Regions:
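Non-ligating segments of multi-cofactor redox enzymes
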Residues: 2-365
C-alpha cells in the first residue's frame, strides 16, 4: 500500500512528472553523444575522428529531436512548461548546480586555458576534444580547429537542436516559429558557415580577411575597429573594403533605423546569437531570472554603463590607429575626435528635441 500523500486537488489522476520510455531513450542517445565528447576531452585516440565527431553530434541532435517529439507532439497545442519547478535541473536542484559549475568551468578553460582542451601552439597537431573537430574545420575552412571553432560548433548545435524543440513547444504561435527559424538561420549561416568560408578565401595571397560575423554589430563586435581587423579588411581588396563599409553602415544606418521602427527585438530576438541561445537552449530556465524591481534597475545601469565604456574604448582604439599628419591622412586623430564630439552632440540634441517627454517618463532610476 502506497502511503505517499498527494496534495493535488485534481479529481482525475495528477500529472505525472516521470519520463516516458521514448524520452528515456532520447536522453540516453544525447548523453551518449556527450560522452563521446567527454572521452575526446580526456585525449582518447579515436581510430576515425570524422566518424566519431558526426556520431557524437548526430546523437545529440537525434536525442533532442526524439525527446521534443514525445514531449510536445503527443499533447494538444499550447505552451507546455510542465514540471519546470519540479525538475532538479530547472529548479536550482543538484543537477542545475552541477550544470552551472560545469559550464562556468568550461568557459574559464575556453578563454584562459585552451591548452587543456587540446590546443597546441608549437605547430604540432591538436589533441583532446579540439582534435576531434579538426576534420570538420578542415572541411569548412581548410585550417585545423581552434577552441573557438569547437565552441562555435557546439553553440550552433545547441541553437539548432533546441530551436527545433522550441518550435514544437510554440507550434500554435506562428510569430514564435518564424522568430526561432530566423535565429537558427542567422546562427548557422552568418555566424558559423560564412566566417569559415571567408577563412578559406585567405588561402589566396589576395585575401587576408579577419574573422567576421556579418550579423554581429558593434558594440557586440567590439574588435571590428582593432588595427589587425582594419588592416585585414584593407589588405583584402574590394571584398575586404565592402565588408568594412558594411560594418560601419550597420552601426550608423541599419541598426538605428530598424531599432527605431521595431525596437531592439529585431536584433535580440530575430538575429543575435546571444538571444538565439537564450530563447532556445535557455528556454527551460527563463523562469529562474529575478523578477524584482531592483534586478531590473541593476540591469539598466549595467547596460548603459557598458555602452558608455564601449564608446570610450572604441574611440580610443580608432584614435590610436589613425595618424596625425593631415598631409598623409584625410581622417586624422584630431578630425576623428571632433567628429565623435559633433556626432554625440547631434544625437543628444535630437533626443532632447524630439523625445524629451518620452525620455522623462522612461529614464528613471
Amino acid at each position: 500500500m502506497n502511503s505517499k500523500i498527494n496534495h493535488s486537488m485534481s479529481l482525475a489522476k495528477p500529472d505525472a512528472h516521470a519520463l516516458s520510455i521514448k524520452q528515456r531513450i532520447a536522453i540516453a542517445l544525447g548523453i551518449t553523444g556527450l560522452f563521446i565528447l567527454a572521452l575526446a576531452l580526456f585525449n582518447t585516440n579515436f581510430p576515425n575522428k570524422s566518424l566519431f565527431l558526426w556520431l557524437s553530434l548526430g546523437l545529440i541532435f537525434l536525442g533532442t529531436i526524439l525527446f521534443a517529439n514525445d514531449a510536445y507532439l503527443t499533447k494538444l497545442e499550447g505552451i507546455k512548461n510542465d514540471a519546470v519547478w519540479f525538475k532538479s535541473i530547472s529548479s536550482r536542484g543538484t543537477l542545475g548546480w552541477i550544470t552551472g559549475i560545469v559550464l562556468t568551468g568550461f568557459y574559464i578553460v575556453l578563454y584562459f586555458y585552451p591548452q587543456y582542451l587540446g590546443l597546441t601552439s608549437d605547430g604540432s597537431s591538436n589533441t583532446g576534444i579540439i582534435s576531434l573537430f579538426d576534420p570538420l574545420s578542415y572541411l569548412l575552412s581548410g585550417n585545423p580547429a581552434s577552441q573557438w571553432f569547437v565552441y562555435g560548433t557546439l553553440y550552433t548545435v545547441a541553437i539548432l537542436a533546441f530551436g527545433y524543440k522550441f518550435m514544437l513547444k510554440y507550434r500554435h504561435n506562428r510569430y514564435q516559429q518564424l522568430r526561432t527559424a530566423s535565429v537558427m538561420f542567422f546562427q548557422l549561416g552568418f555566424a558559423f558557415l560564412i566566417p569559415e568560408f571567408m577563412a578559406r578565401l585567405n588561402e589566396s595571397p589576395n585575401y587576408n580577411l579577419p574573422y567576421y560575423d556579418l550579423k554581429s554589430i558593434w558594440p557586440l563586435n567590439y574588435y571590428l575597429f582593432d588595427s589587425w581587423s582594419i588592416n585585414g579588411f584593407l589588405s583584402s581588396g574590394t571584398l575586404g573594403l565592402t565588408l568594412l563599409i558594411f560594418g560601419v553602415v550597420s552601426i550608423f544606418v541599419i541598426s538605428p533605423f530598424l531599432t527605431y521602427k521595431y525596437g531592439k527585438r529585431w536584433y535580440c530576438s530575430w538575429v543575435c546569437g546571444c538571444g538565439g541561445l537564450a530563447e532556445t537552449a535557455g528556454d527551460p530556465f527563463r523562469h529562474l531570472s529575478s523578477k524584482k524591481l531592483s534586478a531590473w534597475k541593476i540591469e539598466r545601469w549595467l547596460i548603459h554603463t557598458v555602452l558608455v565604456f564601449s564608446v570610450i574604448m572604441t574611440t580610443a582604439v580608432v584614435y590610436s590607429f589613425l595618424g596625425k599628419d593631415p598631409n598623409s591622412y584625410w581622417l586624422t586623430q584630431n578630425v576623428f575626435l571632433i567628429g565623435v564630439g559633433v556626432l554625440l552632440s547631434v544625437i543628444f540634441a535630437v533626443v532632447m528635441l524630439f523625445k524629451r517627454d518620452e525620455l522623462g517618463k522612461d529614464a528613471k532610476y
